[in-house]
């Protein structure tokens, strides 16, 4: 085993079980470990949302238990400027962004990485992400996490091999139940804490209410493909392609009991377009165009490749071909049609366990 005792690692402590166990595992591996709690959101109002205070207390408790220092830093300005403003702009444009991807790109693996290296003299940062790193020929690769159910490489595809080389992912080698077992065994307060599902750093808010604070909702018609009006939506931003729940329209058309699905948004005219059945042709795509590309090895794609893609988190791998249109634009064709390919979300590419990178879906391609 290489001597890690001279190497300093700063663990991004979220107050959750994954980062807690990451800190412990790194300690076991002999590193000099300290924690860092990032405050990335200022408006921590009323009791329902006071999760940040609880998270900080939990992170502190874990660090005390492990006998390591916990630093805190406020990245709220960076988060607002580089993540949240973009998030709102995408919703305004009728797209459905993924703030976690942007947050990893701008905060956890940029602001945090720089702060740890420059202010805390760290050799590495570490996070509780379920991904793995492999170094080949002097370049770091991003691999899927060992626990297929928890793999988070989809959210980290913008990282470069240099950023990965400066990062450690201890729980990526484990399955989630094992992580909880370790936390319980060593008596960490976070052992039974449930996984967070809120928007990145904003916590478990009621999403519709939260979005409504920053973007005025514009109600408009819900229409079928044939132009028949079925009711009113409260704002296109509250709906995403393939959505079934929360449309407020029931049941039958010409005797069909099939549920209604969002199959398109007409942003220009503020119309939500719906159809019955989740395999409606308008919901299916044969491919997509993506831009804002990030390849982990930072090499530009110059020729067609065959690989697999995910167009959303936890989706089954989809075999596809990827053809470069320009340096920052690709055309992707799926082996079989895929439902609910959503502009604003990311398409992330893999060969085997290796995450190649990805880009933001600009448009879906249909027959």
Swiss-Prot record:
Q: Which InterPro entries match?
A: MnmA-like, MnmA-like_C, MnmA-like_central, MnmA-like_central_sf, Rossmann-like_a/b/a_fold
Q: Where is this region: Interaction with tRNA?
A: 150-152, 312-313
Q: Where is this site: Interaction with tRNA?
A: 129, 345
The organism of origin for this protein: Photorhabdus laumondii subsp. laumondii (strain DSM 15139 / CIP 105565 / TT01) (Photorhabdus luminescens subsp. laumondii)
Subunit notes for this chain?
A: Interacts with TusE.
User: What gene is this protein translated from?
Assistant: mnmA
Q: List the disulfide bonds.
A: 103-200
What protein name is recorded for this chain?
Answer: tRNA-specific 2-thiouridylase MnmA
Q: Which Pfam families match?
A: tRNA_Me_trans (PF03054), tRNA_Me_trans_C (PF20258), tRNA_Me_trans_M (PF20259)
The kind of enzyme this is, by top-level EC class, is transferase
Per the entry, what this protein does is:
Catalyzes the 2-thiolation of uridine at the wobble position (U34) of tRNA(Lys), tRNA(Glu) and tRNA(Gln), leading to the formation of s(2)U34, the first step of tRNA-mnm(5)s(2)U34 synthesis. Sulfur is provided by IscS, via a sulfur-relay system. Binds ATP and its substrate tRNAs.
Recorded GO cellular component terms are: cytoplasm
Q: Quote the EC number.
A: 2.8.1.13
Asked if the keyword Nucleotide-binding belongs to this entry, the reply reads yes
